[in-house]
Amino acid sequence: KRSIISKSSAIGKGTIVQSEVNVSAECNIGKFVKLNTFCNIMHNSIIEDYTTIAPNAVLLGNVKTGKLCYIGSNATILPNICICDNVVVGAGAVVTKDITTPGTYVGVPARLLKDI
């Protein structure tokens, strides 16, 4: 099955894009990122190096993730959110505000479960 990557988006060296991934306009995907099946990266988003986006995760417009992050299956990151380095977002979590402290975040809305 095919993935769709906008011509205006950039994909870094060593990044893995699995099937049925959607990367829309003006996105910048870093080096050695993993985009799992059925994830959606919406316009003007930035994913820093060594980050994993799990299956069915959705990053809505203008989202920025730091380095070494893990966005869990079926997680949703709302528009205009920034996530710092070294953050784990649990499966099904909904991130409604910026995350500025490294750690594990779970729930709806996402809240800090554990510091890293």
Sequence positions of predicted segments:
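Structural signal for interior beta-strand "rungs" in well-ordered beta-sheet cores
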Residues: 3-106, 110-113
